[in-house]
Amino acid sequence: MSKQLTAQAPVDPIVLGKMGSSYGIRGWLRVFSSTEDAESIFDYQPWFIQKAGQWQQVQLESWKHHNQDMIIKLKGVDDRDAANLLTNCEIVVDSSQLPQLEEGDYYWKDLMGCQVVTTEGYDLGKVIDMMETGSNDVLVIKANLKDAFGIKERLVPFLDGQVIKKVDLTTRSIEVDWDPGF
């Protein structure tokens, strides 16, 4: 595989997916997309992977659906052994490639690390992850060490207007209407 270190390595890397196991003997790999529409992962190029702490650009040659999976063929990955070396590599792009969002919409990456405070001023903790459920996204909040309720982690639905009262990315804070006991 022709892996090349590039001067255009992502400045603000964001993970869009992950390469899975190899498929067949000609260098195809399963791909798992983290984008809202799974096929949207192919709209963002170039892709980067990180091997031994170094960014490497990879070129998508082809992709297709196979049963319930999507499989990809990367340029220079021509056999099963080469494909196996890429198993579990994260697919990364620079965040500058992502489209600008409308007011009130947020990328999950921008919410990570935000401090979450109730409308009454109680500090719930910091956002450490997001979950997608069938009906709405959910903030996963790591509670402060000395949480008065002894809670280590909270799940708060991201319901704009109902639960989420204010998001301020400048101050990295989210105000919520939420009972700290939950």
From Swiss-Prot:
It is found in: Cytoplasm. It comes from the Bacteria. Keywords: Chaperone, Cytoplasm, Ribosome biogenesis, rRNA processing. GO terms for molecular function: ribosome binding. The keyword rRNA processing applies. Its main location: cytoplasm. Residues 102-182 form the PRC barrel domain. GO terms for biological process: ribosomal small subunit biogenesis; rRNA processing. GO terms for cellular component: cytoplasm; ribosome. InterPro entries: PRC_barrel-like_sf, PRC_RimM, RimM, RimM_N, RimM_N_sf, Transl_B-barrel_sf. The keyword Transport does not apply. Belongs to the RimM family. The PRC barrel domain binds ribosomal protein uS19. An accessory protein needed during the final step in the assembly of 30S ribosomal subunit, possibly for assembly of the head region. Essential for efficient processing of 16S rRNA. May be needed both before and after RbfA during the maturation of 16S rRNA. It has affinity for free ribosomal 30S subunits but not for 70S ribosomes. Binds ribosomal protein uS19. HAMAP family: Ribosome_mat_RimM. This is Ribosome maturation factor RimM. It comes from Shigella boydii serotype 18 (strain CDC 3083-94 / BS512).
